[in-house]
Amino acid sequence: MKTLILFSTRDGQTREIASYLASELKELGIQADVANVHRIEEPQWENYDRVVIGASIRYGHYHSAFQEFVKKHATRLNSMPSAFYSVNLVARKPEKRTPQTNSYARKFLMNSQWRPDRCAVIAGALRYPRYRWYDRFMIKLIMKMSGGETDTRKEVVYTDWEQVANFAREIAHLTDKPTLK
């Protein structure tokens, strides 16, 4: 069995999570390829038994390239076992780590034609020193309003790697949908 893991990232944390998922799946005996949804032209769907897509939030929105990819490939995504993970800083709060309690994931799933079999909401990373001035200012303002870290010299990884490992185990059990050839 082979899994395609696609990601849409702004600052790299969604890519790190995708790589971690691939590593966890490998330990479970499942081969996985990882690719950036912004750079992949057309996936070779017939080479995969399942697909996982992760996307990050910036200023309340997923990247348009991710949304366009999902819209374009919704029929294919629905025809095979699939999973979605949303990465955002709101999920640093444990009560905001489910598709039901995270407004970004909930809104995306309600409005999307894609119906993934599994979903996760995973906390991202706050990397102030890597941000451009404007992003550092805006994210600090948002974090101040939401009770988060405001020291712009810090980098904080909120990702719960055990949650990611558990999600990999869920992905490993995705089966039973016929794939389109």
Curated annotation (Swiss-Prot):
Mode of membrane association: Peripheral membrane protein
Boundaries of every Flavodoxin-like domain copy: 3-172
Cofactor dependency: FMN
Enzyme kind, highest EC tier: oxidoreductase
Metabolic or biological pathway, per its Swiss-Prot or TrEMBL entry: Porphyrin-containing compound metabolism; protoporphyrin-IX biosynthesis; protoporphyrin-IX from protoporphyrinogen-IX: step 1/1
Claim: Membrane is one of the keywords in the record: yes
PROSITE patterns: FLAVODOXIN, FLAVODOXIN_LIKE
Catalysed transformations (reactions): protoporphyrinogen IX + 3 a menaquinone = protoporphyrin IX + 3 a menaquinol; protoporphyrinogen IX + 3 a ubiquinone = protoporphyrin IX + 3 a ubiquinol; protoporphyrinogen IX + 3 a quinone = protoporphyrin IX + 3 a quinol
Source organism superkingdom: Bacteria
Alphabetized UniProt keyword annotations: Cell inner membrane, Cell membrane, Flavoprotein, FMN, Membrane, Nucleotide-binding, Oxidoreductase, Porphyrin biosynthesis
MF terms in GO: electron transfer activity; FMN binding; menaquinone-dependent protoporphyrinogen oxidase activity; oxygen-dependent protoporphyrinogen oxidase activity
Cofactor-binding details, from the entry: Binds 1 FMN non-covalently per subunit.
NCBIfam families in UniProt: PRK11104.1
HAMAP family linked to this entry: HemG
Classification via PANTHER family: PROTOPORPHYRINOGEN IX DEHYDROGENASE [MENAQUINONE], PROTOPORPHYRINOGEN IX DEHYDROGENASE [QUINONE]
Protein name: Protoporphyrinogen IX dehydrogenase [quinone]
Underlying gene: hemG
